[in-house]
Amino acid sequence: MDHLIIPKDYKPDLNLHDTQVAIKTVKDCFQELLAERLNLTRVSAPLFVDPDSGLNDNLNGVERPVAFDIKEQDGKIAEIVHSLAKWKRYALDKYGFSVGEGLYTDMNAIRRDEETDNIHSIFVDQWDWEKIITKEDRNIETLKETVRTVYKVLRKTEKYMSIKYDYIQEILPKDIFFITTQELEDVFPDVSSPKEREYYICLLYTSRCV
């Protein structure tokens, strides 16, 4: 927990009960808008998979999965998922989705080797989504348009929450800034670390997509 920062004398604006209500409110708002704008259908995701299935994402290849044996299946080993990157593609085919359609899910996972801080935890609770597009649509313009759509959903969610909770301020800029990793390197040639370059571009553009 060396990287967790809690300001001195920090006091939350909501108590624990109301925080849970607010979390549900923001999640409901965001996922409904996202599903509508991107033509996504909610599906249930696995918490664990067969390690021999090839469906567990090994992330960087060094993270150790949490595994356990299943008594009813003669001690067969199952692994808690790291992410759903591979499973989503499998599910799109399994559920029979068509071009222009997609799925989203509320994923839970355990990443035992995660370096924890204010935004990272060994317990993962995040949205995952994937949709089918044509080969012709696999281009930078489709990517940018999709990012803009997601960003608009974020802004609408922010606006909704700012109306519902008066202490929440709208801080997201109207537009999102796009830059490639090569362009970042050209802008900051004296900065060797990619993460540092991303940090510096964030100082110039608070909403950006690399």
Which ranges hold each PLM region?
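Conserved small/polar residues in nucleotide/adenosyl-binding loops
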Residues: 205-210
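Extended, charged alpha-beta segments that form solvent-exposed binding/catalytic grooves
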Residues: 105-194, 198
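Class II aminoacyl-tRNA synthetase-like tRNA-binding/catalytic domains
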Residues: 2-120, 128-132
